[in-house]
Amino acid sequence: GDVYKRQVQETKMQPGQADFAPEGYTEYTYSAEKKGYSGTACWCKTAPLSVATGIGIEEHDHEGRVLTLEYPEFYLVNCYTPNSQDGLKRLDYRMTWEDAFRAYLLELDAKKPVILCGDLNVAHQEIDIKNARTNRMSAGFTDQERAKMTELLAAGFTDSFRAIHPDEVKYSWWSYRFHAREKNAGWRIDYFIVSNRIADKIKAAEIHNEVFGSDHCPVELDIDL
């Protein structure tokens, strides 16, 4: 079907910086206060009822990480989860963020179903990463980060790709180092996650690893609401 909404994370842009405007789409952006860092954006064919930036907590709302578009039947949440960084310097902050963000999603979910899209900076299971054994202490595959994803799903959400493709090995991100993409030494860290009560409406969930142009590739959800 038609692509009605395109979400992008880590835009690194300030308002008005985009030099492209897809015809028939309206742009919504949320930039970090620090220039050239983080940021989220969404291009939509259908205008939302409302647009919200951040999660309403001062500590977490300086980096342009969460953009929420409300539609009659659902909330669309575009998220760029903080990276725990080399040496896990930001892991403690990441844990605080995870709990606050999950609470925010549950608040929305109490009103209407949620579709969460984004770079969630975690490979949830061993199937989601090429080199599981050597990355146990790497940002994005620590036990702590993986446990937070488990907690999110247990709170009433479904990982759309894994629901449709329980055993498929496919990645959405490859380091620019070590010829990782050529070797397909990747991670699946980009997701569409939906409220359990609309999971049966998923028609397709795909990872387009044939698309180049970034260290990430696009992920797609086709859902009939």
Where are these regions (language model features)?
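Short, small-residue-biased leader/transition segments that mark boundaries at the very start
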Residues: 1-4
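Active-site metal-binding loops of divalent metal-dependent hydrolases
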Residues: 11, 120, 217
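Metal-dependent phosphoesterases centered on the DNase I-like endonuclease/exonuclease/phosphatase
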Residues: 26, 97-185, 189
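Surface-exposed cleft-lining segments at the edges of enzyme active sites
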Residues: 56-57, 81-98, 133-137
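Surface polyanion/phosphate-binding segment centered on an Asp-His-Pro turn
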Residues: 206-225
